Curated annotation (Swiss-Prot):
Database matches in HAMAP family: PEPcase_type1 (MF_00595)
EC number(s) given by UniProt: 4.1.1.31
Protein name per UniProt: Phosphoenolpyruvate carboxylase
Keywords: Carbon dioxide fixation, Lyase, Magnesium
Length: 948
């Protein structure tokens, strides 16, 4: 049975009505800001764009003064943003509406659980499933937080308008509020003057927990258990969704991530979740006014109530209230101990700092960063409670388990005394939240490049006179040295090594901080350490040496899992050999056994794409998962995959449900992790309705892929794979011949794209390249993909696809085309692959791309565009042939209509950006005026709804 996507239920008429209102308001605001002459030019440009008269549009743009471009660029940047807001509101509305009328849609949780409810292992599947979205600081969110806040205000107003009956809306007041926020948008800086710091990235992401994640995940957990129980499946402690975090721990290529940012990330996360609990417990305190005159309580609740510092005579007969007051006091005390804690004392628990806190002369306060993300009313409540806490030494919680046990005491008492209806809602939700978030909120990954680990280990070995030049050893010799250190030498090599290099000192401090955080906040706070550019077993063992230095690993087990990240085509091809050797090591087997026999492997989508093109990347990743899963089976190890996907197709992006359900058979057991990056976080999780829906998609897709085994998968997979091997080999050659084989390509890319402006764009704390860029290989994947998106070529998402399939079809035109069409209908992987190419082609614009090619001064370099254009046309023709369609996006009319609506406006921005780049290169722009290029980058990314 097939279901429609939720987007297919969208109300296009309502969206157009809303956009018309928003556009009229924007037009009115703009008219009052600009001169009549400039405003008239905007009206002309808009009309020309809507009617695709781009040559005339180009001529007007060339005549604009730079001053006129300031507000014109803003106008055409805000227009697609307003369309996006209306579409997002419509999606959020439909999520609620379709659930209320019990309408099935693709990925609906109830339908998914129905699918497996009669299976013998249904309880095992639902109990053990764990899907982990990992939020990263990859710099693809071009919007300032201030602009995002204004966007949210407009979203809220539109949503309120839909939720209230038309006759009850004060239309004049509502329009006035909309106008105010649009006017603020038009006169607020859209881009950052200063580069983001890691601390900014941490606090920005924390906002999403307060606005969406905490409530959405809690609601999802309650619904997950309820749906299972309705079908006779009693779940004990499921965790279908938990959260991961890279910000503060991902130091690969980012020198600004330090031990301090790691500690800040962990402590701010704890502040956020503790304050969430404090707020929820306060709500329960206000709600549970049950009187002993009218109801009974358990002895345990009575004892807890007696410990409360709330001695008001008005509550002496309200034991539940006093019990919740006691719990709240303990939570506040826990928060204060966290803030006062000095993590330099290893092993110190939160409660061990009670005496220091209570004897402090001044009231402990939240950190400055904490104040940015914690609501004022909670800060006030904490301050009001401090006086009571100091009079009597209220204990704190050592662990989240203790907190849950206190809540469970109240829950059990209510059940025991006929309060089944009372426990539903806030109390049940809070119990579920504690299961998911603990006191840590999200597990922070640490990540570093393998070359850094090698340099640190080489220094340690040389300082101890073990090996003078470790880096010169062969792979076999390296492994021998490392294993001897891990198995036979108990020394902490860094203890006697002084002075240490700056690099080694920094790395050791981060690992020490990780241990201190685990000791203080629990094992869940940091669980994985990822090794970028993993190429060999020694890369994994070098990290083990670093972990050994701080006591996070020994010969019997590890407190942090070692996770290799295979990124390039070559590394992915060699990953099976690397992991087979690693899994055969007895010490590695003990480490894995200490992690319940799971071994995580991270897969890099971005670098493999830049290395070999879209088709080669996708297929290499697919085969690697198949082969690595088989190697895990050989050693009795459950291989789990961490998918390092970006927002764009060129970086592994695309529709989430299809991406997961098209993974190889058995590659998803009961765990899967995937990155959520940059602008994707806001698009998917910007409000609690959207967050719930996208979490539902993740979990439903994982369950479906775990249990769905189509006969066609096994029956025809060998033939499918042989065809893919042949096509991909040719695609790889075609891609590499141009990108790395044609000496003109480097100049073409840097001259025909806004890469220099993107590299100076303040959209993240991380540099645009790991080193000085002298070749394509040295450029990070994000600016690479971002630049091609801006120039509207979308090169990483399709180049090499057309020629490779055309050559295969031409070998036997009648049979080969028919078989590819069959593959498209029957093989989820192949359908997802081509659908993504279809989507990318629909966002490209070769007429605009031609204009960017004209930025190249040398005609010989400029001719590269003709190669790209020919391949684009061939790819489009082949894709449509295989799909059996006459136009792109024939199976995704929602996106097609959305792009048709938005595209004329951000097309205008491309022509403005082109003119600005020309003027910049001619020295006609001041440094301040050059920022206009960034505004156009922002607007185009907004229109495309993705960037890097």
């Amino acid at each position: 049975m097939s279901f429609n996507k939720l987007e297919s239920f969208s109300n296009k008429e309502v969206i157009r009505e809303e956009v018309s209102i928003l556009t009229d308001l924007l037009t009115d605001v703009t008219r009052k800001i600009l001169s009549p002459e400039t405003f008239e030019k905007i009206a002309m440009m808009e009309d020309l764009a809507v009617h695709s008269k781009y040559q005339e549009l180009k001529e007007i743009v060339e005549e604009l003064t730079t001053e006129e471009m300031v507000y014109i660029s803003r106008y055409f940047s805000i227009l697609p943003l307003l369309i996006n807001i209306s579409e997002d509101v419509d999606l959020a509305y439909e999520i609620n509406h379709q659930n209320n009328i019990d309408q099935d849609y693709l990925g609906k949780l109830s339908t998914t659980i129905d699918l497996i409810s009669t299976r013998e292992n249904a309880k095992e599947i639902l109990e053990n499933l764990n899907v982990v979205p990992v939020l990263t600081a990859h710099p693809t969110q071009v919007q300032r937080k201030t602009m995002l806040d204004l966007t949210n205000h407009i979203h809220t107003l539109l949503r309120q308008h839909r939720d209230v009956k038309a006759g009850l809306v004060n239309e004049k007041k509502w329009l006035g509020n909309l106008r105010r926020y649009i006017e603020l948008m038009m006169q607020t800086d859209m881009i950052r003057d200063k580069k983001l710091k890691v601390t900014n990235e941490i606090t920005n992401v924390m906002e999403y927990y307060n606005s969406s994640f905490l409530q959405a995940i809690t609601n999802f957990m309650v619904e997950y258990k309820r749906l299972a129980e309705e079908r006779g499946i009693k779940l004990d402690n499921p965790k279908p969704i938990t959260m991961g975090m890279w910000i503060g721990g991902d130091r690969d290529g980012n020198p600004f991530v330090t031990a301090e940012t790691l500690k800040l990330s962990a402590t701010l996360q704890s502040e956020v979740i503790l304050n969430y609990y404090i707020d929820k417990v306060y709500t329960l305190y206000r709600t549970f006014s049950l009187s002993t005159n009218l109801s009974e309580t358990s002895q345990a609740v009575a004892e807890m109530a007696a410990l409360s510092t709330d001695k008001s005579v008005y509550r002496e007969n309200e034991p539940y209230r006093r019990a919740f007051h006691y719990i709240q006091s303990k939570l506040i005390q826990t928060l204060l101990y966290l803030k006062e804690g000095n993590f330099s004392n290893e092993g110190q628990r939160l409660t061990d700092r009670a005496e220091k806190t209570l004897s402090a002369k001044t009231t402990p306060s939240l950190s400055n960063k904490g104040r940015e993300i914690i609501p004022n009313y909670i800060q006030s409540r904490i301050s009001e409670t401090l006086t009571e806490l100091k009079k009597e030494e209220t204990p704190s919680y050592k662990t989240a388990k203790e907190f849950k046990e206190d809540l469970q005491v109240i829950y059990d008492s209510l059940i025991e005394h006929h309060g089944e209806a009372l426990v539903t809602g806030d109390l049940t939700e809070l119990l579920q939240a504690v299961d998911v978030f603990g006191f840590f909120l999200a597990s922070i990954d640490m990540r570093q490049d393998s070359s850094v680990h090698e340099a640190c280990v080489a220094e340690l070995l040389a300082s101890a006179n073990i090996v003078k030049d470790y880096s010169s050893l062969s792979e076999e010799e390296k492994c021998q040295v490392l294993l001897k250190q891990l198995l036979e030498d108990p020394r902490i090599l860094s203890a006697t090594h002084e002075p240490k290099s700056e690099l080694l000192q920094k790395e050791l401090e981060i690992f020490k901080t990780a241990r201190q955080l685990k000791d203080a906040l629990g094992e869940e706070v940091i669980k994985q350490n990822i090794i970028s550019h993993s190429t060999s077993v020694s890369d994994l063992l070098e990290l083990a040496i670093m972990l050994k230095e701080v006591g996070l690993i020994d010969e019997n087990g590890t407190r942090v899992q070692i996770v290799p990240l295979f990124e390039t085509i070559e590394d992915l091809d060699n990953s099976c050999e690397t992991m087979e050797k690693y899994l055969s090591l007895p010490i590695a087997q003990k480490w894995i056994a200490s992690k319940n026999n799971y071994q995580e492997i991270m897969l890099g989508y971005s670098d493999s794409n830049k290395d070999g093109g879209y088709l080669s990347s996708c297929w290499t990743l697919y085969k690697a998962q198949q082969q690595l899963t088989a190697i895990g089976d050989k050693f009795g190890v459950k291989i789990t995959f961490f998918h390092g996907r970006g927002g764009t197709v060129g970086r592994g992006g695309g529709p989430t449900y299809e991406a997961i359900t098209s993974q190889p058979l058995r590659s998803i057991n009961d765990r899967i992790r995937l990155t959520e990056q940059g602008e994707v976080i806001g698009n998917k999780y910007g409000n609690k309705d959207a967050a719930y829906y996208n979490l539902e998609m993740l979990v439903s897709a994982a369950i479906n892929r775990m249990v769905t085994h189509k006969k066609s998968d096994a029956h025809t997979s060998n033939k499918y794979e042989r065809i893919m091997d042949q096509v991909v080999e040719r695609s790889y050659q075609i891609y590499r011949d141009l990108v790395f084989g044609d000496e003109r390509f480097y100049d073409y890319f840097f001259e025909s794209s806004p890469i220099k402006a993107i590299s100076s764009f303040n959209i993240g704390s991380r540099p645009a390249a790991r080193k000085t860029i002298t070749e394509i290989g040295g450029l990070r994947a994000i600016p690479w993909v971002f630049s091609w998106s801006q120039s509207r070529v979308m090169f990483p998402g399709w180049y090499g696809v057309g020629s490779s399939f055309k050559e295969f079809i031409d070998q036997d035109p009648e049979n080969n085309l028919a078989f590819l069409q069959l593959m498209y209908k029957r093989w989820p992987f192949f359908k997802s692959l081509l659908s993504n190419v279809d989507m990318v082609l629909s966002k490209s614009n070769m007429n605009i791309a031609f204009e960017y090619a004209q930025l190249c001064e040398d005609q010989n370099v400029r001719d590269i565009f003709n190669i790209i254009l020919d391949e684009w046309q061939l790819t489009k023709n082949v894709i449509l042939e295989i799909e059996g369609h006459d136009e792109l996006l024939a199976e995704n009319t929602y996106l097609r209509d959305s792009l048709d609506y938005r595209m004329p406006y951000f097309n205008v921005l491309n022509y403005i950006q082109l003119e600005l780049i020309k003027r910049q290169r001619n020295g006609q722009l001041t440094p301040d005026q050059e920022k206009l290029i960034h505004i156009t980058i922002n607007g185009i990314a907004t229109g495309l709804r993705n960037s890097g």
